[in-house]
Each structure stands twice: as structure tokens, then as C-alpha cells.
Amino acid sequence: GVSKYSAVAIPACNGDQSVVPFAAGALDFDAAYVNLGTGAFVLRPTADALSAPPLLTSVIRMDGQDTDFVLEGSVNGAGAALDWYERHQGAAADRMLALLGDGELADEGAPFFLNGVAGLASPFWKPDFESRFVGDGTDLQLCRAVLESVAFLVKANLDEMDRHRPAPERLVASGGLAENRLLCRMLACLSGVPVDRGSDREATSRGLAFLVAGMPKDFEAPPVERFEPDADQRLLARYLKWLALMREASGS
């Protein structure tokens, strides 16, 4: 398009969230895109606009000829949940995450975190939900529970998407919180598919560059690190317990 005010060409106009799936080039309809920042979102490409409550349906690209739709899941408390942990526990989340490192996927003795930080979004939709721990633990276990809750909320949205689309063959992770290897491994375990994390964390900028360049076929994707799924039954069992607690607490 061209701005009527200055006759300056506008090659692309889009929201930051909508360009993330294009960071590695053309849209992969066999993938689900998970961006992990202050909040998180899950995008699952679809050929048509689907009505799939409690998920959202969004248009992420439209050029006058083609339209790309996605099912969208929203998680308000990702990095923000770690900020919540710091305020309420008085412990540095960065230090706790460093201590957790790239270790065990699950701690069966850890409490659960019912994560409604900044409002509980999909698939529960309870804006006034009170975030809280169920059970007691050390500062390290509490931090693990918060990190784990982010993975669990993503998993809950993926489960909803699987009711309307075939399960994805992989997850594509981006955003600042995706730098946490333990979280990426949790997502791989819970989803049962590999998680690909791009080496370039600026997914928004890369996605926009791809669209502005006219979606070139030779667009160079950044190298990825792949996290293969580890079928850790302890983490899967914790997810089911957490899901039951969330449903009870939210009245879902």
C-alpha cells in the first residue's frame, strides 16, 4: 500500500505477534508456533477460518489474494509469572532458574502453581482468577512450579487445538523465555513432538523482514536447536493433576 499523506510505500503492516511465525520463512502448516515472553501465545496455522471456542481465530497475513489464518491460544503469565514469584517470594527468579539449570524434567515433591497472573486466558478465560500455590516447597521448588505452569498452560492450549486440527509435527519456540532449556524440554515432553528453537531470538524482526522482502523463497532461516521429546511420565502425571486443580479452581 501507499500512505495517502506522504506517498510513502508501506510494504507490510502487521502486528508483532502475527509476524513471528514467518521468522524462518514460509508458514509451516504442520507446526505450532509458541512465543514465550512476558506473556505467551500459541499459533496453529489453518487453511480456513475456524470457529473453535475457547480458542481465538486470527488472520496473520492477507495480501489481497491469499489469507493465512491461525488458531490462537493466549497465556498471560509467562515471564510475568516469574516476576510475580519474585514479588511474592522475595527470591531472585534468575538465580533460581540458574540453579534448576537443565536438570530433571519433574520434581514429584514440588507444589503446583495455579497461574492466573495478569488474568487467566485461554482455554479457561477467568480474568479475575487468583494465582496461588497448591502445596508447600522450597524457593527452588516454587520457582520450578511457576516455570512448569507456563509449559502446562501451553499444553492445555495445544490440547484444545488438537480437537480441531491434526496434532502438530513440531513446535517452533521463540521469545526471551525460550532461552530456558528446561522449559523447552518440558514442552517437548508434554507435546510429544520436537521443539525447534531458533538461534536468532528476534523472531518479530525476522518475520517482518521476510514479509517486507516479498516472502522470497531463498530467505535464510536461522539455525535451530532441536529438543527431542522425552516421555517422562512424572511430568505428564503432574500435568494431569495440575489440569484437574485448574479446572476445579476456575469452575471450568
Please identify what each model-predicted range represents.
Residues 2-174, 179-252:
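Active-site core segments that coordinate phosphate-bearing ligands/cofactors
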